């Protein structure tokens, strides 16, 4: 996501403040426990995290996430300025750290037992 994303309906200024936005269609596309787990892991890595604002999840998240059926869809938006120069679209020095952190998150998620994802 762009580093500057304006303000939301709550008049919270997101410019340069939010590193990650987790979109779970307000709890409808992903188990709240799974969203909370991702939020805690990302936050523990030192990033700022918000849920569903300004991005609550797009078409795929809304249409394919069915937590009651064991299908969880969580949109993860990452502030571009953390890993790239937004003017010329080249990697910056933060790319390696983001890659390591997302690898850690992914390994944690794929190691979960299905019952841990119950909606």
Short names for language-model regions:
Residues 86-119:
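His/Asp/Glu-rich mid-to-C-terminal helical/loop segments that flank catalytic regions of hydrolases
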Residues 1-83:
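Catalytic cores of processing enzymes, dominated by hydrolases/peptidases
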């Amino acid at each position: 996501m762009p580093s500057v994303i304006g303000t939301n309906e709550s008049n919270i200024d997101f410019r340069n403040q939010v590193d990650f936005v987790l979109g779970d269609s307000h709890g409808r596309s992903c188990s709240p426990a799974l969203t909370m787990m991702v939020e805690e892991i990302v936050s523990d890595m030192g990033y700022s995290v918000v849920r569903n604002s300004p991005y609550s999840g797009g078409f795929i998240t809304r249409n394919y996430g069915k937590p009651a059926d064991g299908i969880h869809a969580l949109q993860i938006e990452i502030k571009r300025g953390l890993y790239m120069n937004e003017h010329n679209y080249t990697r910056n020095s933060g790319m390696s750290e983001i890659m390591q952190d997302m690898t850690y998150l992914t390994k944690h998620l794929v190691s979960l037992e299905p019952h841990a994802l119950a909606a």
